[in-house]
Amino acid sequence: MQPDVATLTLPFTDSLITIGTTMHGGAIASLIDTAAMVAAWSDDSVPADLRGTTVSLTVIYLATAEHEDIQATARVLRRGRNLVYLDVEVQSLSGKSVARGLVTYKLG
């Protein structure tokens, strides 16, 4: 893992299906939120004992994830004193864009 970037993979399982073989949007949103949190905490200057929370989460669904694993890459756009602003891109492992997320995460 490098500072200000985190990449997480969500394997497709039947428990994530909403209709047919389509992955549920809530699972995709949760992946975006988790990847953003990991990237927010990836800076070496952040003490290990701090707590944090998601302040805002916007998800744009671009395509369905059909019976395939997906991967989210979160990148820090800006670090403020307490808030971290992040962009998260979700793709299938074959490279299809599935969703985009904009996250504000509060440290402390």
Regions found by a protein language model. Name each.
Residues M1-M23:
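Catalytic strand-loop segment that frames the active site of acyl-thioester-processing enzymes
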Residues Q2-V5, T9, S45-P47, L62, ...:
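Hydrophobic/basic alpha-helical segments enriched in Actinobacteria
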Residues T21, S30, L50, K96:
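Residues that recognize and position ribonucleotide moieties
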Residues M23, M37-Q71, V76:
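Hydrophobic beta-strand-centered segment that forms part of the acyl-chain substrate-binding groove
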Residues A27:
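Amphipathic alpha-helical recognition patches that constitute DNA-binding helices
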Residues Y61-T73, L77-G108:
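HotDog/MaoC-like acyl-thioester-processing domains
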